[in-house]
């Protein structure tokens, strides 16, 4: 897998600037095109939150349109600022810039109006990787639906970045990677799609979480290590006793202890992973880990 088309979902908040900065850095590292997608939801997107009768109010419609305009203007300013900071040419639908001849990073700001989940699904399928910030509290749940759609409706790897401002601009650096492995299809796909990152890493750990009484399949783990060696990647296998924790919690805690720059893992069931990302005890663990996650469903 090569990375030549990056999609960054960006709502225009300060908490997403780390994800935006990472998207530009990835584009520079892989001489890729980064498309920054900003979606303005239609009033109908809020029916499930406020009710159909409320949404039909002209006052509510005007308020939504005003908020959409302010978000769009804020997002555009941030994107222009980061493009200039990274010295990456920025285009839009009226000024398409190609990187065929220069073989350098290029960027495009994409603004679309409509249903957030559908737009993210359609645009995400036309990318090699999707970058989005996690833990951005959205009272209207629109941003939440964008994250869920990216993970479960695109078939593409999603780089879920910790929320926060960008402290500095630097080339993408991911030298210490932890790879979660349970032998399942999702884990296998996540491993394959993370190969571009694994090949550039100085240190790779293969993490396997085991519950109480579960046997360790050392032969299967050795098979994974040999597969990675075929790609020039040398990994160290680590077995984790989950104990009273869930496997996800155990993996995240160990990845943090190992000072990992990235944790690669498969996204399992829809409802289970929705809880991991958006709420509940596991979300607390995600916040505590404070490391990027590369997910694939």
Regions from the language model: what does each represent?
Residues 38, 134, 266-268, 297:
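Short secondary-structure boundary segments
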Residues 144-146, 219-222, 252-253, 277-282:
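Charged helix-capping and loop-helix junction motifs
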Residues 1, 50, 81-130, 230-263, ...:
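Structural beta-alpha unit
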């Amino acid at each position: 897998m090569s990375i030549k088309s990056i999609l960054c979902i960006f709502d225009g908040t300060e908490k997403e600037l780390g994800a935006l900065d990472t998207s530009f850095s990835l584009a520079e590292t892989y001489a890729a095109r980064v498309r920054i997608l900003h979606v303005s939801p239609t009033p109908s997107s809020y029916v499930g939150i406020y009710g159909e009768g409320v949404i039909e109010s002209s006052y509510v419609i005007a308020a939504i349109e005003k908020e959409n305009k302010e978000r769009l203007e804020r997002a555009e300013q941030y994107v222009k600022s980061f493009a200039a900071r990274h010295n990456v040419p920025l285009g839009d639908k009226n000024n398409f810039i190609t990187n065929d001849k220069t073989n350098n990073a290029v960027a495009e700001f994409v603004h679309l109006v409509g249903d957030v989940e559908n737009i993210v699904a359609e645009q995400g399928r036309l990318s090699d990787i999707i970058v989005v910030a996690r833990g951005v509290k959205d009272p209207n749940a629109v941003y939440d639906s964008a994250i869920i759609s990216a993970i479960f409706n695109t078939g593409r790897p999603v780089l879920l970045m910790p929320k926060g401002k960008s402290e500095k601009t630097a080339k993408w650096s991911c030298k210490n990677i932890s790879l979660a492995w349970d032998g399942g299809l999702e884990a296998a796909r996540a491993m394959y799609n993370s190969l571009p990152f694994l090949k550039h890493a100085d240190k790779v750990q293969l993490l396997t979480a085991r519950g109480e009484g579960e046997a360790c399949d050392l032969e299967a783990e050795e098979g994974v290590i040999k597969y990675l060696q075929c790609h020039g990647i040398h990994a160290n296998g680590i077995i984790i006793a989950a104990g009273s924790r869930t496997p996800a919690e155990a993996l995240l805690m160990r990845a943090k202890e190992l000072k990992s720059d990235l944790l690669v893992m498969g996204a399992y069931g829809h409802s289970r992973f929705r809880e991991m990302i958006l709420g509940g005890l596991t979300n607390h663990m995600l916040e505590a880990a404070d490391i990027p996650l590369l997910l694939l469903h």
